[in-house]
């Protein structure tokens, strides 16, 4: 029984997203982030992004871009972006 409960908690910990739910829920790889207000040259990462260190690696491999969690992306630009959980 203890193993079962520990497994449930471990599974839940693995499912935590690097981007918060709600407003900043869109993971993006961006070329420039201007004071967290505007991000330029953004696109959705080509690979799944769990955990945060993997998100950094994926964006870095895609042209040295910065991983960000943003509001709704429009035409390669995002407004209001924050750093993802688990990144430097």
Curated annotation (Swiss-Prot):
Keywords: Cell wall, Disulfide bond, Secreted, Signal. GO terms for cellular component: extracellular region. It comes from the Eukaryota. The keyword Secreted applies. Induction: Expression is up-regulated in the presence of root and stem powder of Shanxin poplar and under nitrogen starvation, but not under carbon starvation conditions. It is found in: Secreted; Secreted, Cell wall. Gene3D superfamilies: Hydrophobin. InterPro entries: Cerato-ulmin_hydrophobin (IPR010636), Hydrophobin_sf (IPR036686). Disulfide bonds join 19-69, 29-59, 30-42, 70-81. Transmembrane segments: none annotated. The keyword Ribosomal protein does not apply. Residues 1-15 form the signal peptide. Aerial growth, conidiation, and dispersal of filamentous fungi in the environment rely upon a capability of their secreting small amphipathic proteins called hydrophobins (HPBs) with low sequence identity. Class I can self-assemble into an outermost layer of rodlet bundles on aerial cell surfaces, conferring cellular hydrophobicity that supports fungal growth, development and dispersal; whereas Class II form highly ordered films at water-air interfaces through intermolecular interactions but contribute nothing to the rodlet structure. Belongs to the cerato-ulmin hydrophobin family. Homodimer. Homodimers further self-assemble to form highly ordered films at water-air interfaces through intermolecular interactions. This is Class II hydrophobin 1. It comes from Trichoderma asperellum (strain ATCC 204424 / CBS 433.97 / NBRC 101777). The lineage of its organism: Eukaryota, Fungi, Dikarya, Ascomycota, Pezizomycotina.
